[in-house]
């Protein structure tokens, strides 16, 4: 039932840590998900330095999905969007042929507080890799279906699962779900998609007689229902879908074509990618 278990790799960004879950050397993608980061958890004091912010930077060939448990982030991008994301909301940014954006912790810098959340990259199918860039923000149960019963709280972040559909405009069959489980509660993930995984964002769960702990991802074999039992209060992120084929990933670029990534690198280095309208005073240079 469990094909593989691995730990998120912690990276210190100076003001807080990020756990890099995907890509993993032995399993680079789950369905169309090419990248998964756990941001925090971390506590910020008012007035922390702006160096913690993510300055403007580019993407191609993917959609980014930001989802928070705690805190807030201010998003600005090159299609003119300005959005403050708060817990249990979704920022969905489709890069397509190319977009730039920044993510800044302006509210936390002013008031202090905690940051804890997830960021995923979802590879676009080949026929959609060069679509026009776009951005949408989603919140509330009308857009992100919510279910609560007997110690389980479930929110469908994106895609389709458990008979529900999120309003996030995805481009291939996928699912992304946030579970909160009280101790002793069991919940099942059906065999609906060929590629499925679970990331334990907090707590401990048991699956198929094996204990999974905080900051671990388990990748599941296809064709079987997966039953989770919470050993303590736990936060579990479920994700997967239909594969879209292999992808090249370099810096912030994802593509089915290595040449396309080289072109994007050249465009960014030469200043040919438009910076966000509302945040164009600085940017992250291409790594050498």
Curated annotation (Swiss-Prot):
This is Pirin-like protein CC_3178. It comes from Caulobacter vibrioides (strain ATCC 19089 / CIP 103742 / CB 15) (Caulobacter crescentus). Pfam families: Pirin (PF02678), Pirin_C (PF05726). Disulfide bonds: none annotated. InterPro entries: Pirin (IPR012093), Pirin_C_dom (IPR008778), Pirin_N_dom (IPR003829), RmlC-like_jellyroll (IPR014710), RmlC_Cupin_sf (IPR011051). Belongs to the pirin family.
């Amino acid at each position: 039932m469990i094909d593989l278990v691995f730990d998120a790799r912690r990276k210190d960004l100076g003001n807080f840590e990020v756990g890099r879950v995907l890509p993993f050397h032995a399993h680079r993608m789950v369905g169309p998900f090419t990248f998964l980061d756990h941001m925090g958890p971390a506590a910020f004091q008012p007035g922390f330095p702006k160096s913690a912010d993510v300055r403007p930077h580019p993407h191609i060939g993917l959609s980014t999905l930001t989802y928070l448990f705690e805190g807030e982030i201010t998003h600005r991008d090159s299609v003119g969007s300005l959005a403050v994301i708060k817990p249990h909301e979704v920022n969905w940014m489709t890069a397509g042929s190319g977009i730039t954006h920044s993510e800044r912790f302006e509210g936390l810098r002013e008031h202090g507080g905690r940051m804890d959340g997830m960021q995923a990259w979802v590879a676009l199918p080949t026929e959609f890799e060069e679509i026009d860039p776009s951005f949408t923000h989603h919140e509330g149960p009308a857009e992100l279906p919510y279910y609560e019963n007997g110690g389980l709280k479930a929110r469908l972040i994106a895609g389709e699962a458990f008979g529900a559909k999120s309003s996030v405009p995805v481009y291939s069959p996928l699912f992304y779900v946030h579970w909160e489980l009280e101790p002793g509660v069991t919940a099942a993930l059906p065999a609906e998609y060929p590629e499925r995984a679970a990331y334990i964002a907090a707590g401990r769960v048991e699956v198929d007689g094996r204990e999974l702990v905080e900051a671990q991802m388990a990748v599941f074999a296809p064709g079987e229902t997966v039953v989770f039992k919470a050993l303590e209060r736990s936060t579990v992120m479920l994700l997967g879908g239909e594969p879209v084929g292999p992808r090249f990933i370099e810096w912030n670029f994802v593509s089915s074509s290595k040449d396309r990534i080289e072109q994007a690198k050249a465009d960014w280095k030469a200043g040919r990618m438009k910076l966000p309208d509302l945040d164009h005073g600085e940017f992250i240079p291409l790594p050498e």
